[in-house]
Amino acid sequence: MLRLAYAPVWIAASVLLVVTVLYLSLAPLNIPAELPTHFDKVEHAAAYVFLVIWFTGLVARPRYWRVVAALVVFGLTIEILQAAMPFGRQGDPWDVLANITGIGVGLAIASVATGGWALKVEAWLNRS
């Protein structure tokens, strides 16, 4: 983790974020009928773009590979859990592909624009 003055806050927010994604991924599903087919793939990709941007904001660039590895394992674990669930959820290899696509897009964005964002936020907070 970067040397962050508000590290406990960033860690707590990170735990909350991961728990929220886990809950939303495993909770019983209520999809409105008007959503397009396979719209959930867009949701998967967007969620993982956000997760990568979040976590690459908290670690040094040489550690980005750890973020990628952890999120791939997280996504695979969720799909395995969904496949084992007896109600309303099922594992889907296309969801895994959407997750990995989101991870790639998020990594590209972090590499050129948003990496280390937490340091910038803390610098801004300390100016106030």
Question: Which stretches of residues belong to each language-model region?
Answer:
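Bulky hydrophobic segments
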Residues: 1-94, 100, 104-128
